Swiss-Prot record:
It holds the Pfam family GTP_EFTU_D2. PROSITE patterns: G_TR_1, G_TR_2. The gene is fusA. Belongs to the TRAFAC class translation factor GTPase superfamily. Classic translation factor GTPase family. EF-G/EF-2 subfamily. Keywords: Cytoplasm, Elongation factor, GTP-binding, Nucleotide-binding, Protein biosynthesis. Catalyzes the GTP-dependent ribosomal translocation step during translation elongation. During this step, the ribosome changes from the pre-translocational (PRE) to the post-translocational (POST) state as the newly formed A-site-bound peptidyl-tRNA and P-site-bound deacylated tRNA move to the P and E sites, respectively. Catalyzes the coordinated movement of the two tRNA molecules, the mRNA and conformational changes in the ribosome. SMART domains: EFG_C, EFG_IV. This is Elongation factor G.
Length: 697
């Protein structure tokens, strides 16, 4: 079967934003204009097409990044049909993992900002993730019809807070309730969308006289930015004082793909203005799979290899999301980087070392699905029938194996205990939690050895609340949930040398393991490190991995309160063995004993997670909010003014003090303040806090 759309006409984009910037509405409009949806779904009615889990529709926030395929030929049908895969990503800070996961498989992103709120803390997180994966992006300033909307303020915030290099390619005509349309700086025309056709039609007119000077100034900045793309364009610009439309687009496209600039547009998705222009920019300025470097990976012989985005390359793909669908069972969303695969073919998963048969292949449109026979380089689709694959796994041609770079997922910062309400729930709960943990790598499940309770861990209160809710709805499991617990860590502050000796000789085969370890603090963030410094075979080679294994197991539970020990370095420098009685188990035990004894002498310390908190509050409640943050051991780090007497307070607060904060910030401000928080780093807990935690254990 030949390719329907050439790969150069593919765009794999993510739509990413802070909660409430209007991202889901923007995506809905894209689906409407590209002809997929005939009735626009509104988030207000809980009917948005991309938000397809029940909780999302109730809460009006997006949790799962559903992948959708649509086609666009331009506002004037000026392009050949382009195949656009959209990955909708959540804006709530507890779901940052979803954003991270979709950034890995995108070629480009559209960042949506609210014209009133501008750049929010979550926007900074998403921006950092896009930088980490080198994702080219454009910015869309939404909600231009809202009171307090200011496009140019958001341009400045992108420069200041995100260190971005925004280049507006349109400027707004009016703002707030007088927002009428945009000036297209490339064509130098004013564009007004027709409200009766829900923005399907538009008029291009002369630029209003009062905007002529502004438009000329912004156009000049845009043309200069385009000219910097190459020497050839710069010479043209210097000679002629301007560039042709085609040259401007070429220059902007080159620099956008190189992540040097971010084209900026604006509009109001809710009122059907501006999204159409953004779609044109996606086609003109964002990369196709062949415009970005080939994907890299590790070949079977451990050397580095790569795969070009071409049909004639060997097949390679990355599984980036797992979902349980009520009708077809487990769906694995995957991005094809190279080659072609048909339903029924065998793929190899090098991470699990297993071959699997690819069952049906589905192209997803939010929650509707279309069965297709094959997928090619650049496609994003969902597979049914893969039993082994989990998020971040590579799928490839069994004859030409490559392992693509795996994703790294953050450690959870909060735990709660869950108890099934009945015996029948007990069995179903294990299955349900296993399924949910498979879908979401930032969610962990374990059994507490002492209490026998099931402990679930995640990225925040909302994250766990929604997972428990899904367990109730999708798996019919009723469970009661305990109070949230903080994920403390332990570390050491001093270096010590410690002996560990495990000897058991009571008839028959004995056990003998003996080690000397240097135990010292490691650099923050470095984690666990093991160094083998044995000379002259005093501990035989074959037992050294057992020492490493014993230590790895031991650091999962520290001596203060049983929390994992982080940032610690072990050097095995001496020891002894017995010809007959020594074995791996004995050395594992000896290492574990040395760690337990040594840690007690190495000034063990409790670490607690600190959160970056931002509170937006009307000025009159500022005192209450600041006082409350201080009473929670918060350190205020700065303040900013926003439109309409709103103040933004930034602080660092220990997570243990933030439980139930949403209720208390509402009562402090009569429901008018909002806040967001995300994990920042671990820091030493004050003595009184550490003692309280240790005594509780």
């Amino acid at each position: 079967m030949a390719r329907k759309t050439p790969i150069e006409r593919y765009r794999n984009i993510g739509i990413s934003a802070h909660i409430d910037a209007g991202k889901t509405t923007t995506t809905e409009r894209i689906l409407y204009y590209t002809g997929v949806n005939h009735k626009i779904g509104e988030v207000h009615d809980g009917a948005a097409t991309m938000d397809w889990m029940e909780q999302e529709q109730e809460r009006g926030i997006t949790i799962t990044s559903a992948a959708t395929t649509c086609f666009w030929s331009g506002m004037d049908k000026q392009f050949q049909p382009h195949h656009i895969n959209i990955i909708d990503t959540p804006g709530h800070v507890d779901f940052t993992i979803e954003v991270e996961r979709s950034m890995r498989v995108l070629d480009a992103a559209c960042m949506v900002y609210c014209a009133v709120g501008g750049v929010q803390p979550q926007s900074e997180t998403v921006w950092r993730q896009a930088n980490k994966y080198g994702v080219p992006r454009l910015a869309f300033v939404n909600k231009m019809d809202r009171s307090g909307a200011n496009f140019f303020k958001v341009v400045d915030q992108l420069k200041l807070r995100l260190k971005a290099n925004p280049v507006p390619i349109v400027i707004p005509i009016g703002a707030e309730d007088k927002f009428e349309g945009v000036v297209d700086l490339i064509k130098m025309k004013a564009i007004y969308w027709d409200e009766a056709s829900q923005g399907m039609k538009y008029d291009a007119r002369e630029i209003p006289a009062e905007l002529a000077d502004d438009a000329a100034t912004w156009r000049e900045q845009m043309v200069e930015a385009a000219a910097e793309a190459s020497e050839e364009l710069m010479n043209k610009y210097l000679e002629e004082g301007d560039l042709s439309e085609a040259d401007i687009i070429l220059g902007l496209r080159t620099r956008t793909i190189a992540c040097e600039i971010q084209p900026m547009l604006c509009g109001t998705a809710f009122k059907n203005k501006g999204v159409q222009k953004m779609l044109d920019a996606v086609i003109e300025l964002l990369p196709s799979p062949v415009d970005i470097p080939p994907v890299k990976g590790i070949l079977e012989n451990e050397s580095e290899g790569e795969r070009r985005a071409a049909d004639d390359e060997a097949f390679s793909a990355l599984a980036f999301k797992i979902m349980t669908d009520p009708f077809v069972g487990q769906l694995i969303f995957f991005r094809v980087y190279s080659g072609v695969i048909n339903s029924g073919d065998t793929v190899y998963n090098p991470v699990k070392g297993r071959k699997e048969r690819l069952g049906r292949i589905l192209q997803m449109h939010a929650n509707q699905r279309e069965e297709i026979k094959e997928v090619r380089a650049g496609d994003i689709a969902a597979a049914v029938g893969l039993k082994e694959a989990t998020t971040g796994d590579t799928l490839c041609d069994p004859a030409k194996v490559i392992t693509l770079e795996r994703m790294v997922f953050p450690e959870p910062v909060i735990h709660v205990a869950v108890e099934p309400k009945t015996k029948a729930d007990q069995e179903k709960m294990g299955l349900a939690l296993g399924r949910l943990a498979q879908e979401d790598p930032s969610f962990r499940v374990r059994t507490d050895e002492e209490s026998g309770q099931t402990i679930i861990s995640g990225m925040g209160e909302l994250h766990l609340e929604i997972l428990v809710d899904r367990m109730r709805r999708e798996f019919n499991v009723d469970a009661s949930v305990g109070a949230p617990q903080v994920a403390y860590r332990e570390c050491i502050k001093k270096s010590v040398e410690q002996e560990g000796k495990f000897v058991k000789q009571s008839g028959g085969r004995g056990q003998f393991g003996h080690v000397w370890l240097k135990i010292e603090p490691n650099e923050a963030g470095k984690g666990y490190e093991f160094i083998d410094a044995i000379k002259g075979g005093v501990v035989p080679r074959e037992f050294i991995p057992a020492v490493d294994k014993g230590l790895r197991d031991a650091v999962t539970s520290g001596v203060l309160a049983g929390f994992p020990v982080v940032d610690v370095k072990f050097t095995l420098f001496d020891g002894s063995y017995h010809d007959v009685d020594s074995n791996e188990n004995a050395f594992r035990m000896a290492a574990s004993m040395a760690f337990k004894e040594g840690m007690k002498k190495a000034s063990p310390t409790l670490l607690e997670p600190m959160m970056a908190v931002e509170v937006e509050t009307p000025e009159e409640y500022m005192g209450n909010v600041m006082g409350d943050l201080s009473s929670r051991r918060g350190i205020v780090q700065g303040m900013e003014d926003q439109v309409g007497g709103i103040k933004v307070v930034k602080a660092e607060v220990p997570l243990s003090e933030m439980f139930g904060y949403s209720t208390s910030v509402r009562s402090l401000s009569q429901g008018r303040a909002t806040y967001s928080m995300e994990f920042k780093h671990y820091t030493e807990a004050p003595k009184n806090v550490a003692e309280a935690v240790i005594n509780k254990k």
